[in-house]
Amino acid sequence: PNYKKLMDANPEIEKRTTLGDGKIYSFASINTVPRDLTFKQFINREWLDTLGLEMPSTIDEFYEVLKAFKTQDPNGNGFQDEIPLSSVGLNQTRNFLMSAFGYVSTGIEVGDDGKVVFVPTTENYWEYLQFANKLYREGLLDNDVFSMSEDKDLAQKGSQGIVGCF
């Protein structure tokens, strides 16, 4: 009944989810405020515990954790081989990081004031780019982030015990 009400109130959604045979085979994923989406990263809890660190809850704390992952040998093998943050491309990681700067899209969003915003033209996006660049420059972001093409590449690194967050 709730889905039917939603469709009645939003005929454009019903039109987009109805196939040529007139049937709807799945529920539409509807989010009117992209900033409400959550993008998650997985963090190596064992490394946090080994280093006596708390789960980060701000972007600054996250940065400090990544630095500790890089410099304090949390996997305990005596080598500085840790990759603090890895990703296949930047898709999920980009959205996760951008959320700390107020956006989750590199396209168009509607602000709280109802105005349409092209995200790459905002000050917050510039701050995100500077932060991401800092992670890359300081070796906190995997150097292979732009060349890994499949999840298996990341899984292989993960199986070596060298990835702190992905």
Descriptions of predicted regions:
Residues P1-F166:
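Extracytoplasmic/secretory soluble proteins
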